[in-house]
Amino acid sequence: MASLIYRQLLTNSYTVELSDEIQEIGSTKTQNVTVNPGPFAQTNYAPVNWGPGETNDSTTVEPVLDGPYQPTTFNPPVSYWMLLAPTNAGVVVEGTNNTNRWLATILIEPNVQQVERTYTLFGQQVQVTVSNDSQTKWKFVDLSKQTQDGNYSQHGSLLSTPKLYGVMKHGGKIYTYNGETPNANTGYYSTTNFDTVNMTAYCDFYIIPLAQEAKCTEYINNGLPPIQNTRNIVPVSIVSRNIVYTRAQPNQDIVVSKTSLWKEMQYNRDIVIRFKFANSIIKSGGLGYKWSEVSFKPANYQYTYTRDGEEVTAHTTCSVNGVNDFNYNGGSLPTDFVISKYEVIKENSFVYIDYWDDSQAFRNMVYVRSLAADLNSVMCTGGDYSFALPVGNYPVMTGGAVSLHSAGVTLSTQFTDFVSLNSLRFRFRLSVEEPPFSILRTRVSGLYGLPAAKPNNSQEYYEIAGRFSLISLVPLNDDYQTPIMNSVTVRQDLERQLGELRDEFNNLSQQIAMSQLIDLALLPLDMFSMFSGIKSTIDAAKSMATNVMKRFKKSSLANSVSTLTDSLSDAASSISRSASVRSVSSTASAWTEVSNIASDINVTTSSISTQTSTISRRLRLKEMATQTDGMNFDDISAAVLKTKIDKSTQLNTNTLPEIVTEASEKFIPNRAYRVIKDDEVLEASTDGKYFAYKVETFEEIPFDVQKFADLVTDSPVISAIIDFKTLKNLNDNYGISRQQALNLLRSDPRVLREFINQDNPIIRNRIESLIMQCRL
């Protein structure tokens, strides 16, 4: 029978390792502490932001365009372009290795006929014949000689509109630009001792690394960015490049101030934020063509990374705010594809990422000021999600993208199953990106944003790198931890998930077929078959079963078994000590605890109701211990639970133990049990109702509570799946034989299935009412 799962959990739920007990005790310990915050804090909330001051950055970023610098003579670094920006005609730059290469560059204005001009090159007056036939472009000309007393020859002219020129030392050569803008390219001159060549620039210049040569070529051909051409850009001396910058460390703990008991610490940290989105996709009832909701939900993610040689364990919670609700209605027919609501995040939305790690910075994050952060941006793209229809091509929601840009940081608290974590909440504003999203095989296309259908696009996580800085008030002794005001046993996040799961479970009650339920209730469900719908591997199922058993150990059902075991132990001791029949009768009634009740309470209508209600609450255990061939309430309860577990879309390893335990306690709260003696049936329910009647005629007879208590002790207890009122109604309207009546009284599953297959409305309504009682 399906109720085997409950008996198996009861049998095995006590095999919990001692280490698990110790860990659980430590995690559920609460502590209330009153703190005098001292002179640094006025409230127990985060103080006002006094300004972040300097936020050190541990990442050295080499600028693309470094400058401008004033005209000077120096030895440029190898593999760096000098981007020269002359304003007038004349000598632009000159350089030599004083051995076999003297190289200079001159600038000639537009529309110059062939003429001889005098230039000062390397301190000497030199006559050079020059010309520029272009009406609009300036002309750069290289003048080169190989001996100190030799003559200059002209090489590699560059016709330029932006009036920019470049020169670089690299790989035993001196590189320059030639050709005509906007299609200029590089050329070179071979030289020895190239790294010792000193350059003299006669105009402002910039320095660009070789890695950004494409950018340098873009400037040569098209000009500098507009901001570089304003009067607010002032050239500085090249010696400013020699200033030594202190490289910040990935981890910095700086003492800002201290008193006798407290100190202010500034924590600077490089961090790696990994996060992912979670979603909920709920299918509506009916023929399988309609979905009620596709929505975002908060997602927790735990990971490790290395920071300055130290392994850091981090925890993030990602949530969204300001979502946009869309819908699609393919028509009014039952087979038309419909999504009642699907959520999309766009430029009016925000993403919140709560970050915590196990470093010292988060250990005392209670009184904090001067909080600042600098984070990179990240793009999130949507994947393909197919809506599986029973027949026809599947609609596919595909595409969509947004970029996340840092928009601030505040203090926050993350809630996990056992603890609350003081953390940082990073707020991100969104901008929509290409491509747009669409639903293939529908009219929906060209919409921008990130839909909730598959926001992670098959990626395990998204990653953002950055750095934060804060000043925290902490105890002077590092061994002490700042007390927090609230308990650490906070389960809000788990309770929220359980609330959503309870709603889903309750809605699934309407989708259970009764004939299949009866068949499932007859199967011997064990832990592996019960949880096989969630995990496919045996190891995963075993781990999940262990978690369920740990939680089940604390259930009211397990506590009842423990109490019953103690009662039976006391009963056995009393039997061994006393030979009186009354003593045996009293102690043997440990199943019901009614011996004293029956003798102490006056037998009135109200007292009988109280007694039968008390007895009925204990009969579940008696029935489980004396299993019969008939079906019982726990068989139906377990079958409904199995069906809902297989259909659920929100169930996970964290919520499963809670759901299984709640189901064992709350499914079918109104139960009735009966005992049969010859032609008499005594039946009592947990709500205090009781009946005694004849099997042949269903005629009611006086109810004897003492007789009921004695029969409960000596006879099998049967679940009243079809209770007395239903049986009487069935007999009055349809008429049933004595054998059928006995089979229904014994809850024979074969007869129940026959009545259901015959679509008997009275039996169906009774079973449906039991299914609807399977609620959380």
UniProtKB/Swiss-Prot annotation:
Residues 484-518 form a coiled coil. The keyword Membrane applies. The keyword Amino-acid biosynthesis does not apply. The record marks 231-232, 241-242, 247-248 as: Cleavage. One of its GO terms (biological process) is permeabilization of host organelle membrane involved in viral entry into host cell. Residues 248-479 are annotated as: Spike body and stalk (antigen domain). Residues 510-776 are annotated as: Spike foot. A motif (DGE motif) lies at residues 308-310. It comes from the Viruses. A motif (KID motif) lies at residues 644-646. This is Outer capsid protein VP4. Keywords: Capsid protein, Coiled coil, Disulfide bond, Hemagglutinin, Host cell membrane, Host cytoplasm, Host cytoskeleton, Host endoplasmic reticulum, Host membrane, Host-virus interaction, Membrane, Outer capsid protein, Viral attachment to host cell, Viral penetration into host cytoplasm, Viral penetration via permeabilization of host membrane, Virion, Virus entry into host cell. In group A rotaviruses, VP4 defines the P serotype. Residues 65-224 are annotated as: Spike head. Pfam families: Rota_VP4_MID, VP4_haemagglut, VP4_helical. Belongs to the rotavirus VP4 family. Gene3D superfamilies: 1.20.5.170, 2.60.120.200. It comes from Rotavirus A (isolate RVA/Cow/South/Africa/Offal agent/1965/G8P6[1]) (RV-A). Disulfide bonds join 203-216, 318-380. Residues 389-409 are annotated as: Hydrophobic. One of its GO terms (cellular component) is host cell plasma membrane. The record marks 101, 190 as: Binding to sialic acid. A motif (YGL motif) lies at residues 448-450.
